[in-house]
A protein has these predicted regions:
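Histidine-centered divalent metal-coordination motifs
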Residues: 91, 155, 192
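Hydrophobic/aromatic beta-strand patches that form the interior of the parallel beta-sheet core
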Residues: 52, 88, 152, 168, ...
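Beta-strand-turn-beta hairpins that frame and shape the catalytic cleft
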Residues: 4, 148, 182-186
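Asparagine-centered polar/low-complexity signal
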Residues: 15-18, 133, 185
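C-terminal and late-domain segments of enzyme folds
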Residues: 158-205
Length: 205
């Protein structure tokens, strides 16, 4: 079995350290032959087997952060779309997979999974949606089979998927929204698996 090279992209946004610690912990517990590194170098991504894109804050800041690294978006497209290697987006990192986001204007995303990032309707609920909430798994036949339990969320915007088959799990907060999206080699969670104790580590695994 080939050694895994997992790269967590550092582009000035996202909880890089806790993501790295979670991956390192899984590698240790499960005794997986893998290295995990944090990098903003497209060359490093090219030589990786798995790529993780964390993200928090505003969509626009995150996508700009990626665009400002020369060659980064091209290499990501190459890695994910051309080579079809495993990719995992967390929180805003997952939202960046969409075609566009309506957060503070209209901003273009990576466009890997069809859909738009829209504001959660607040009505009577506190925003952001913050804290623990449960997920309902809609497709149990995949390599990733998360526990239907509580995960840690912090967000005010959600991924409105065009195709229902891209929704692996949903969560309710005023409305049902996708808490895990997927397409072929691409997975994304709206919640923070690195802050979701053991069940979060399960997903990372």
């Amino acid at each position: 079995i080939m050694k895994k090279n997992i790269t967590i992209i550092d582009y000035g946004s996202g909880n890089i350290l806790s993501a790295k610690q979670s991956f390192a912990r899984i590698i240790e517990i499960e005794n997986i032959d893998a290295d995990v590194c944090v990098s903003n170098n497209p060359e490093t991504i090219k030589n990786s087997t798995h790529v993780v894109l964390p993200g928090q804050g505003a969509f626009e800041t995150c996508i700009s952060g990626l665009e400002e690294i020369p060659g980064m978006i091209d290499e990501l497209n190459n890695f994910v779309i051309t080579k079809k290697k495993p990719f995992f987006g967390i929180c805003v990192g997952m939202q960046l997979l969409a075609n566009n986001s309506l957060e503070n204007g209209n901003h273009k995303g990576l466009g890997w999974i069809d859909g738009t990032i829209e504001k959660l309707p607040s009505k009577k609920l506190k925003m952001p949606h913050m804290g623990w909430n449960s997920i309902e798994v809609l497709n149990k036949n995949l390599k990733i089979n998360p526990k239907e339990t509580d995960y840690y969320f912090v967000h005010s915007y959600y991924f409105n998927c065009e195709n229902k088959e891209n929704i692996l799990a949903k969560t309710n907060y005023g409305i049902d929204f996708p808490s895990i999206v997927y397409k072929e080699n691409i997975y994304g969670t709206q919640f923070h698996p690195e802050k979701s104790s053991d069940q979060g580590l399960d997903i990372i695994k």
